[in-house]
C-alpha cells in the first residue's frame, strides 16, 4: 500500500500557468518514446502551441495538487476535458512526490469513475496506468 500525504486539490489560476507549461513540456519531452527523437527546438516551439491551444479551450480544465497547508506550493496537476467524451491530456507530479497517491487522487478528482476515457499524451507512466484503468484508450487526435 502506498503512503499518502495530505493534499488539497483546487482549480488552477493564472499564477499556475508557468508551472503547468514548464512541467508539461519538459516532462513530456523526456518521458515519451517518440518525443525524445524530436529536436528540442522543434519540439518546444510546436508543442508549446499545442498545450496553449488545449488550455485555451472552454472545455479544458486543470486541477492543481498542493500540500494542505501550502496552497502556493504546487505538487502536480492534471489537464482534462469533459464533453462528449472524457479526455485526459496530461498528468504531472513532481518526482519527489511520486508514489504518494497524488496522481491517482488527481485522476479521480478529474475523471471520476472508471468509465471510458481517452488520453492524448503517451508517456512511460501510462504503461502502468492502462492496467489500472482498463477503459482508457490512447487517441492522440483528440489534441
Write out the residue ranges for each language-model feature.
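Conserved acetyl-CoA-binding loop-helix of GNAT-fold acetyltransferases
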Residues: 93-113
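Conserved GNAT acetyl-CoA-binding A-motif
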Residues: 85-90, 112-143
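A short beta-loop-alpha structural element at the N-terminal edge
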Residues: 6-22
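Alpha-helical elements of Rossmann-like donor-binding domains used by nucleotide-donor carbohydrate transfer enzymes
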Residues: 19-23, 49, 105, 109
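Helix-loop element at the rim of GNAT/NAT acetyltransferase active sites that forms part
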Residues: 23-39
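Flexible, charged surface loops at secondary-structure boundaries
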Residues: 54-59, 81, 112-114
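Active-site rim helix/loop that mediates acceptor-substrate recognition in acyltransferases
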Residues: 37-69
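Conserved beta-strand in the GNAT
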Residues: 62-64, 71-82, 87-92
Amino acid at each position: 500500500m502506498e503512503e499518502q500525504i495530505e493534499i488539497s486539490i483546487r482549480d488552477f489560476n493564472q499564477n499556475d500557468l508557468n508551472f503547468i507549461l514548464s512541467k508539461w513540456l519538459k516532462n513530456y519531452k523526456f518521458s515519451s518514446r517518440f518525443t525524445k527523437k524530436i529536436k528540442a527546438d522543434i519540439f518546444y516551439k510546436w508543442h508549446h502551441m499545442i498545450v496553449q491551444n488545449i488550455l485555451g479551450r472552454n472545455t479544458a480544465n486543470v486541477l492543481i495538487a498542493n500540500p494542505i497547508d501550502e496552497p502556493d506550493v504546487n505538487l502536480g496537476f492534471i489537464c482534462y476535458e469533459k464533453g462528449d467524451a472524457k479526455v485526459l491530456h496530461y498528468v504531472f507530479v513532481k518526482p519527489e512526490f511520486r508514489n504518494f497517491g497524488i496522481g491517482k487522487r488527481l485522476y479521480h478528482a478529474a475523471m471520476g469513475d472508471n468509465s471510458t476515457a481517452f488520453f492524448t499524451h503517451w508517456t512511460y507512466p501510462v504503461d502502468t496506468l492502462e492496467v489500472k484503468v482498463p477503459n482508457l484508450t490512447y487517441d492522440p487526435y483528440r489534441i
